[in-house]
Design a protein with these regions (language model features):
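N-terminal core-binding DNA-recognition domain of tyrosine site-specific recombinases/integrases
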Residues: 3, 17, 70-161, 333-339, ...
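N-terminal DNA-binding module of tyrosine recombinases/phage integrases
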Residues: 7-113, 307-322, 417, 421-435
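Short, basic (Lys/Arg/His-rich) helix/loop patches that form interaction surfaces
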Residues: 123-127, 198, 202-205, 215, ...
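Basic, Lys/Arg- and aromatic-enriched nucleic-acid-binding interface segment
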Residues: 124-129, 133-145, 149-151, 164-227, ...
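Catalytic-site neighborhood detector that most strongly recognizes the C-terminal catalytic loop/helix
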Residues: 179-180, 187, 245-249, 385-411, ...
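Short, polar N-cap/turn motifs at the start of nucleic acid-interacting alpha helices
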Residues: 229-237, 375-398
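C-terminal secondary-structure termini that scaffold catalytic or DNA-interacting sites
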Residues: 232-235, 245-289, 410-461
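C-terminal catalytic core of Y-nucleophile DNA break-rejoin enzymes
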Residues: 242, 250-273, 280-304, 321-344
Length: 461
């Protein structure tokens, strides 16, 4: 039962409920009008009777998310980078704005306000939950629609669990998600790919880019290759290489949270006190495990590279630190993805004549080119790129380039229209203005005498 009590100018609703431990708890709620108090009393009694009463909780968004995140991580066996990414979303894009709000007081409009605020927020405004001082240039680069969509996706999942856990009756996350930002990545055509590769003198960068272009690899997959992945006699002597692992640098704290089930190797730290560590891990998805066919030119480069590794080790064998990776520095240490990226950026700075792209753009360039030369054989290209589904591949590379679309339009024109045929209607010839005799006589009746005289003269001549 619930009871209404008048206190001064307000009305209170007092009731008793049982908490999670079965303990009786008294609760008092205050309202400004008697009508509000009566409605709340009816609601409480109805919910207590049918078991839908929501136990009052003061847990905040921050407290809930920081409890939910590790549980999700353990349940779904997240990789360290996945945990790191989701933790960053919570710490930098959610907690600073709604972290102190109580879960049970959160409404859909609060989240709509959050999305609106984020759309006007510069990238990197918060790092590890701490507000950063940004330069004027940095303040001009705002969070993308895709990032805000990821915030929405995480909150939608988290708040569904809040309902399951009895913290909320209904999720306050809006039904409509923020729109993703769809931006076409800059890519290279075949001529640019070949010319760029030919101009790269750094042997590590040259091989990394060559492998990426042939196999449409991710940078972590390139860095994760080992000599054992190469099979020069595979595919009847064509030569193949396997993609079954990737290299990443991860936060040690994230690694401690997620465990090491997906970790194949942890590399020695270069610096003492580092908060990150370089790891070799299983690939992103099962479909990422694949075999790539070598080209004859790549095959020769790989053979020369393996000889180079032997020569490097022979120079100072006692100081050589063999990481076991295919891409190594002269001292044997692994070449990690960020170093490949830095080498590529440096090369681009020195060669402004090429379209500026990110290193991952090489994967897009390769996949796009392979789709074009295969005549759109999505399944064959998917086998090379390692996309999780054919739909994902099609959606990612729907643009295919303007050149191929122009050619498609030309082929349509040649195949659809009959030779010499035209569908353009001729414009009607504009006839000279005419007037009937009766209409002319009517005009003459009211005409000026001088006009009548001119008309008579014109008719006679």
């Amino acid at each position: 039962m619930a009871y209404i009590t008048k206190r001064g100018s307000s009305y209170g609703v007092r009731y008793t409920y049982q908490d999670e431990q079965g303990k009786n708890c008294n609760k008092w709620e205050s309202f400004s009008t008697k009508e509000e108090a009566i409605n709340r009393k009816k609601q409480i009694e109805h919910e207590l009777a049918n078991g839908t009463f929501l136990i009052p909780s003061t847990i905040t968004v921050k407290e809930f998310l920081m409890e939910w995140l590790p549980k999700q991580c353990n349940k779904h066996k997240w990789a360290p980078c996945t945990y790191q990414s989701n933790l960053g979303t919570v710490q930098n894009l959610i907690i600073p704005y709604i972290g102190d709000m109580q879960m049970q007081k959160l409404k859909p409009h609060h989240l709509e306000d959050l999305y609106s605020t984020l759309s006007k927020t510069p990238c990197g405004q918060y790092y590890e939950g701490k507000k950063q001082v940004l330069s004027e240039k940095q303040q001009q680069r705002f969070l993308s629609g895709t990032t805000i969509h990821e915030v929405h996706r995480l909150l939608r999942t988290a708040f569904q669990y809040a309902v399951e856990w009895g913290i909320l009756i209904k999720s306050p996350v809006p039904v409509d998600s923020p729109k993703k930002s769809i931006q076409e990545r800059a890519i290279w055509d075949a001529d640019e790919m070949w010319a760029a590769l030919a101009s790269m003198e750094d042997p590590i960068l040259h091989l990394a880019v060559h492998l990426t272009l042939v196999g449409a690899l991710r940078e972590g997959e390139v860095a994760g290759l080992t000599p054992e992945d190469l099979d020069f006699e595979g595919a009847d002597g064509t030569g193949t290489f396997r993609i079954n692992k990737c290299m990443q640098r991860v936060q040690k704290a994230s690694l401690a949270k997620t465990g090491k089930d997906c970790i194949l190797q942890e590399f020695e730290d270069k610096r003492e006190g580092s908060t990150t560590t370089l790891v070799l891990k299983k690939t992103k998805t099962a479909s990422s495990n694949r075999t790539i066919f070598m080209t004859a030119v790549l095959k020769e480069e790989l053979k020369h590279w393996l000889k180079r590794l032997e020569m490097d080790e022979a120079v100072e064998p006692e100081r050589y630190r063999n990481s076991g990776m295919l891409l190594r520095l002269p001292n044997g240490l692994a070449v990690e993805p960020i170093l490949i990226r830095k080498k590529f950026i440096k090369w681009q700075d020195e060669h402004p004549e090429f379209t500026r792209i990110v290193f991952h753009g090489l994967r897009h360039s390769s996949a796009t080119y392979q789709l074009m030369i295969s005549g759109g054989d999505v399944k064959a290209v998917q086998g090379t790129t390692g996309h999780a589904s054919a739909n994902l591949l099609v959606n990612t590379y729907a643009h295919i380039q303007k050149d191929s679309r122009k050619k498609l339009g030309k082929k349509f024109e040649e195949g659809f229209y009959k030779p010499g045929a035209t569908l353009v209607q001729a414009a009607p010839v504009e006839a000279e203005p005419t007037i009937s005799v009766s209409a002319l006589l009517e005009l003459l009746k009211d005409a000026d005498p001088s006009v009548k005289a001119q008309l008579r003269l014109a008719l006679l001549t």
